[in-house]
Amino acid sequence: MRKILRLKVGREDLILETGLLAKQANGAVLATYGGSTVLATVCCSDSVRENLDFVPLSVEYNEKYYAAGKIPGGFIKREGKPKDKEVLVSRLIDRPMRPLFDKRFGREIQVVPTTLSTDQMNPPDIVGMNAAFAAVFLSDIPFNGPIAAVRLAYLNNEFIVNPSFDEIQDSILDIVVAGSLDGITMVEGGANEVSEEVLLSAIDKAYEYIKQICNLQKEFVSIIGEREKLPLAYEEGVFEFKDELKNLIYSELKDACFVKGKLNRDKAIKLVKQKAYEHFSSISQVNEDNEFLFYKAFDDFEREIVRKSILENNLRTDGRTSTQIRDIVAEVDLLKRTHGSSLFTRGETQALAVTTLGTSIDEQIMDDIDGDKRLNFMLHYNFPPFSVGETGRLMTGRREVGHGHLAQRSLEAMLPKKDDFPYTIRVVSEILESNGSSSMATVCSGSMSLMAAGVPVKEQVAGIAMGLISDGDKYVVLSDILGEEDHLGDMDFKVAGTKNGITGFQMDIKISNVTKQLMKDALEQARIGRMHILSIMDSVISRSRDDISVNAPKIVQLQIDIDKISLVIGSTGKTVKAITDEFEVRVQIEQDGRITLFGTDSLKMQKAKAKIESIVREPKIGEIYDGIVKKINSFGAFIELTPIKEGFLSNRARSRDDRYGDMRHSRYGSGRHSRYGRDNRNTFGMNPPRLEEGQIVKVKISDIDKFGKIELELVRD
């Protein structure tokens, strides 16, 4: 049965519809906001897998070109593998939703939001998020919903709910917030040095609308009726000999949890686990049927030890207190041939960042339904398996795309405008070691490599990952969390920024009772930590170098009148090709008359610039040129001043010059009876100099008539 509900959210109505499309799915909702429409479906498999310690969830957001009235570019005219944007939106949907599924369900779950229409004004990603959340909540799959999402921009000191693309572009804050009726579950966004207070206010504002959208979903259920939920695959059991296990391992496990060094600590914990397993196996208390419960009980004890130590003793497994940051070592210029490089090591997390400068030809061309774009800044994050001491495939997964995007948006607000620095910038972060917060290490290393490359960034940027341990009554915010603290803790809050404010952030929360005061404490602690990290980075490099690397391509720019672009290009590109070949430069001409030269030899580039300036320069009386004799006739010679400008040097204007000899040796005859008359000396009063085609002569513009014809005279040295 078709049902439609709507709610005013910002400038438009959010319309949710079910019962018309994709009725064979476990759940399907069509969401519309303005002219953007997304269909979200959810399905689960029939097969059941027991004793899973994770939710087998996949989210596949996809955008159809027909949604914007377009046909895919390229040779293959159909949508292919997911673009980075689709991967990022899939992660936005996945992260707040995943903790609300019951692991005991045991079936694979697939959520597929598909953009069917877009007005290219209202971003379809936020529409897709709400469509997906509603589809799952209305389905027969066990889900602890409802949840909803809202985007905010901050423009002219006002918050805009679900802003347009243009408003996002002009805003100093772009934030997406997701949550349930119990509280916030996810925050992500980028900013241009906003304060912690503005960020907190944005989250508060977004949560007002999140609660309204959640209630809209509940109203949907009350209208169509709550569906009977599918059964769980198994009931969560308890290891029968848990008390015996605790008595056997607790003391030894506690010591193992505080062994220094990630690898040594992991090895010590695994040894305790192995000994315990062998003990219980030997007395037939662990077998294939209950070993899952054994491992779960062991992990519960490890979690209890780590969390209790932090809450009661303010002591973390590596010996730090809650506010301490791991030792930091930073350096630049490790790689001599690259344009800029930096190594940032924080504890056992290490990021090598390399900046490369290219030309506009190297820009990333984005062909998607929001319109074609050209990106002149890219950040690529690589996480090879050796960074955690493992083997595996070298590939770019969703995690790499997501972490790279967070680091990129944390840095891009500090980059110069393209008009001021017309290079294409690519930063590559190689994670060489990892024990938590590698994306924030990428921000730090990337910022320093940009400065080392001579990119005129506005401010240094640093990042830090914050964690949380809470028992409901008491909480402890952790600075610079380890990988295990991310896994065993209640929050992962990454914050990047400058000394002036926040530029990037991402927060995932596993608990529902996160108060505003808690978030305020976390942001303040992150600010203090960020200042500490910035001070260390600034001691290595505090400002961008005055010059770019000698290995980087050089750029020279000039501006010409639009109506003279054709003169520089020449017939069939002849003129610009000649400049390219002669001076070994790459020439880019914009429609507004801006010309950019790319090359490696500064002297040749300046000569190329002078050549172009001479082509477009308007000649003036009195100017002197080194011209080329192009053609000689009975009245004089045509002299090329520029590739597209010629002047005429008449015989009368030629004065005798010993460098050239006289007309008796010219192509026009010899002696007294030449084609100029019986006696040239009688005609002109002196012998005119000899000229030859291709000869270079110094001439001065003596006159320009009303038709633009140029008269020349010879210049003596």
Curated annotation (Swiss-Prot):
Xref: Pfam families: KH_1, PNPase, RNase_PH, RNase_PH_C, S1
Binding site for Mg(2+): 486, 492
Family to which this protein belongs: Belongs to the polyribonucleotide nucleotidyltransferase family.
Lineage of the species this protein comes from: Bacteria, Pseudomonadati, Spirochaetota, Spirochaetia, Spirochaetales
Enzyme's top EC category: transferase
Species of provenance: Borrelia hermsii (strain HS1 / DAH)
Function statement: Involved in mRNA degradation. Catalyzes the phosphorolysis of single-stranded polyribonucleotides processively in the 3'- to 5'-direction.
CDD domains in UniProt: KH-I_PNPase, RNase_PH_PNPase_1, RNase_PH_PNPase_2
Protein name: Polyribonucleotide nucleotidyltransferase
Residue ranges of every copy of the S1 motif domain listed in the record: 622-715
Alphabetized UniProt keyword annotations: Cytoplasm, Magnesium, Metal-binding, Nucleotidyltransferase, RNA-binding, Transferase
